[in-house]
Amino acid sequence: RLSNIKLGDTVVFVNKDAEQHWPASDIHPTHGVYPEKGGCIGSKFDACKGLKEGKQYSFTFFHKGSWCYHDHLKPNLVGCVDAQ
């Protein structure tokens, strides 16, 4: 899924599933594509843990580009955020 946002917008990832999900910057497993460092594995765009049902993770995009992400626990679940 591609979401179009403006720089400085915050995207909220909400787990609506009974299974845990862990949103993180591509690429799996290093999460290093988003250029801002400081997360638990690679980039700052990383929830750093699985989110239980009803829990959420928010991330504010300050770098222009198309930033793809995946679920670290189920890497076949993917999406992209286009920040302009």
Positions of PLM-derived features:
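Extracytoplasmic copper-binding redox domains, predominantly the cupredoxin/blue-copper superfamily
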Residues: R1-Q84
